Amino acid sequence: MKKLFQFILIIFISSPLFGQSNICSNGKMNNFTKVFEYNKMAYPGDDSFDAAYYKLNLDINYDTRFLIGEVTVSGKSKADNLSSIFLDLQNSFTVDSVIYNNQKLSFTHLSAKLNLSFPNPLSMNDEFSVVVFYKGTPGSSGFGSFEFSRTPTNHPAIWTLSEPYGASDWWPCKDSQADKVDSSDVIVTADESFVTVSNGKLISVTDNGNGTKTYYWKNSYPIAQYLISLAMANYATFSETWNYTDSDTMQVIHYNYPENLTSSRINQLKKTIPMLDVFSELYGLYPFINEKYGHAEFGWGGGMEHQTVSSMGSFGEGIVSHELAHQWFGDKITCADWHNIWLNEGFATYSEALWLEKAYGKNSYDSQINSEMGNPNQWWTAKAASGPLYVQDISSVNSIFNSARSYAKGAVVLHMLRGVLGDEDFFRTLHEYSNHPEFAFKAAVTEDFQSVAESVSNKDLDYFFSEWIYGENYPKYNFSYYINPATSNLEVSISQKSNSNPTFFTMPIKLRIRNSEIDSIYTVFNDQQNQIFEFPEIKSITSVSFDPGNWIMKDLTFVTGIDDENMIPDKFELFQNYPNPFNPTTSIEYTIPSNEYVNLKVYDILGNEVAQLVNEKKDAGNYKVNFDGDKLTSGLYIYKIKAGKFSQVRKMMLLK
């Protein structure tokens, strides 16, 4: 990681608009690569109970790299006759005993699962609490989950980074971010030279009189397991008080390695309070106002949005704003699964641009967005992203923490949604989503965010989310304009090169039209691959600018005239349906370069015909049909087209 981070730093220095969120993404990718090997079978945790409370009481010996733990897990049964549950805990630990109602439970600890058997089965909604006594050397992925390390001046340091599946490397838990506990306590006893930092408020520091101290941190807000953290070193602190209103005040405290707490670092840290002001204005009051915010320096090159205290290896303005924004999007509202990681990382990356806009003006915002869009030769930018924004394979590190997709493209999608909705509805959407009672301090998926955007704007946004979240790539437009000699009206021609999924993009497009009398913005709704828009009121033209505000990620080619033959596809093709997987509807697109009789059918995996979508003669062109699987069961389906001598087959997945 040191070499990787140096490489990233060189790129960042050479390109000042290169978002610092990329530092975050590459570190997380390195972390995930190593922890996933041991944890993939545990995901998504035991769904037979709701976790409600965690209490970690840890005794950590730095010299021997040994941890003795007592962890309380409280929860509620989600089933009748529940006789057993399991917690996630790596096999490197020895479990001494598990206590339930003052008696020892029988247990087994195999394949990173701690299986517990209750003496009497639990009924639906029965509450329980178990205490696990365990010991051993915590797992280390090289950059988390639990690291014994040293500061630049060689003082001992300890830190954790549990995203995505690393919590069970150092404590027993339900390893699923969708099931947040209502509160948590972290109590750590270690050598007296350590200052121990964790989530929430510091309740007490006890000098034990034997060369150790005990720190007690209490978190009173819902929290996901991977956001519970430790950062321990000989910290020096810099703190300020944030006064948002007369009644909304909070301590902002930064824990730094003493040798790094320079005037330059302090100036970087002082950006935090104006950022708190900006994000509270945009998203609602800082979510954990009754506790704290701040940073704890640690030995990893990026940043990690641990709740109420981001762990930081660098302190540039971009990454400070990125990790702070995560307190709303990632911590307050957590993506319910890693398929939807863009709800965390895309939102935080876009918040970097919003901070620049508020602090330095719209030009800074535009420059940042242009940088995030990038080009296909810049691997970290949105145009280089491959595959859907919705992560198909959460076993792939490059899919989850991919800089181009989850970070850059996620941010660009929000920028484009802003263009579709307009500022008023867009910022209302962000605010209402952040404060929605169904999602705030809980977990959400993409459909939840879409529902808020549609409710606020009163617009059907299926087309937008289908193509930008579940589709891939971006539109490549050909554009021309002219005065039609037959009508004397302005006509604007827009065509798109064929894509795979979707075949073409449906988007509202802004046009700036100028002549001697007008200079105005018009919006057209482009929902065909080849489309001509007529403006009967405009008889002369100086120029037409396509998407002058750069609200769409695109490639644009200006052509000087219209050639109708170029609008006819040059080959037969059946495209991948989108979205895919789908529930219950999806779209299937195809092209035919000549007039043909077309037959398009859907079959189940056994070869039984379940639907006939097309059975008629079609003119040459581009077509889209919808398929509704509402009455079908989940599974793999086949769709096949025949057009003249051409035939092609593709697969699609219905998931209910």
Question: Where do the PLM segments sit?
Answer:
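Short, surface-exposed loop/turn motifs with a glycine/proline- and acidic-biased composition
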Residues: V614-V649
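Hydrophobic helix-coil surface modules that form long, contiguous segments used
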Residues: G69, T160-E163, K174-S321, Y350
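Acidic/His/Gly-enriched intrinsically disordered linker/tail segments
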Residues: E345, T349-V412, M416, V420, ...
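Glycine-centered coil/turn sites that cap beta-strands in beta-rich domains
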Residues: D563-Y578, F582-V602, Q612, K624-F627, ...
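Amphipathic alpha-helical substructures
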Residues: S403-V492
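N-terminal, polar/Ser/Thr-rich
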Residues: Q20-I68, T153, L461-Y463, E467
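Zinc-dependent metallopeptidase catalytic helix centered on the HExxH motif
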Residues: S310-S371
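A surface-exposed beta-strand-loop module
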Residues: S21-I23, I85, Q90-T151, E534-I538, ...
